[in-house]
């Protein structure tokens, strides 16, 4: 396979963090497997996550046909259409994605970009059929057992909601460090090694 393209979305307020280190290892793994990599750092770029009344008013308008509606999200849309692998690097807070990343999904996965709703249809039709793999690289404060009891809503958003807008054979990969609040330095290092190893494989 040649010409693999990975779009990495990083969401953490502090670049100098464990999640920031995971971003570095994510990029290293992807590049080792021959991917061309693009990265968006949502906090550093000052992304506006609030889904506004104007966003709602144009929610079902095909954004491919109305570029004026997407001026502030155009770069993200272009990256989504370019990639075959989407990687989300973020902490898990309150069982889900940080508000910044959830807002990115709300505002960027719009009509004509992530989905279409043709006349007479009873469900959304996927538009991100170029995406054949979705990966989350994340940390959880609590143990895997506690997260399982809480339902892991963030994981379900990726594996059930986002995935259905992608290629019908799209693979998902959840690379997580659980119990990060009490883990050792050795466990953190092992997690970072695992991130790079998993991303170095196709």
Functional labels for PLM-detected ranges:
Residues 9-10, 137-138, 176:
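Short beta-strands and strand-loop turn motifs
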Residues 145-149, 153-202:
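Glycine-rich phosphate/pyrophosphate-binding loop and the adjoining helix
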Residues 116-164:
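Short, glycine-/small-residue-rich phosphate/pyrophosphate-handling segment
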Residues 1, 78, 126-129, 167:
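Structural motif
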Residues 42, 139, 177-179:
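Active-site donor-binding loop signature of nucleotide-sugar glycosyltransferases
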Residues 1-113, 186, 190-202:
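N-terminal beta1-alpha1-beta2 submodule of the flavodoxin-like/Rossmannoid cofactor-binding fold
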Residues 83, 89, 129-130, 162-170:
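A structural motif corresponding to the C-terminal end of an alpha-helix
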Residues 13-16, 92, 141-145, 179-182:
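Short histidine/acidic/glycine/proline-rich micro-motifs that form metal-
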């Amino acid at each position: 396979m040649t010409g693999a393209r990975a779009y990495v979305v990083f969401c953490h307020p502090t670049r100098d963090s464990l999640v920031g280190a995971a971003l570095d290892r994510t990029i290293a793994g992807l590049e080792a497997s021959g991917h061309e990599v693009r990265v968006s750092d949502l906090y550093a770029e000052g992304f506006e996550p609030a889904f506004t009344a104007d966003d709602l008013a144009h929610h079902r308008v095909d954004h491919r046909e109305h570029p004026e509606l997407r001026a502030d999200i155009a770069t993200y849309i272009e990256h989504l259409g370019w990639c075959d692998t989407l990687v989300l690097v973020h902490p898990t807070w309150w069982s889900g994605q940080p508000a910044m990343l959830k807002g990115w999904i709300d505002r960027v996965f719009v009509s004509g970009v992530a989905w279409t709703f043709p006349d007479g249809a009873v469900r959304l039709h996927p538009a991100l059929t170029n995406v054949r793999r979705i990966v989350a690289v994340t940390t959880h404060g609590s143990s895997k057992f506690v997260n399982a009891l809480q339902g892991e809503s963030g994981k379900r958003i990726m594996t059930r909601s986002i995935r259905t807008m992608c290629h019908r054979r799209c693979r998902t990969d959840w690379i997580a460090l659980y119990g990060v609040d009490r883990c050792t330095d050795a466990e953190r290092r092992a997690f970072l090694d695992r991130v790079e190893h998993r991303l170095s494989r196709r």
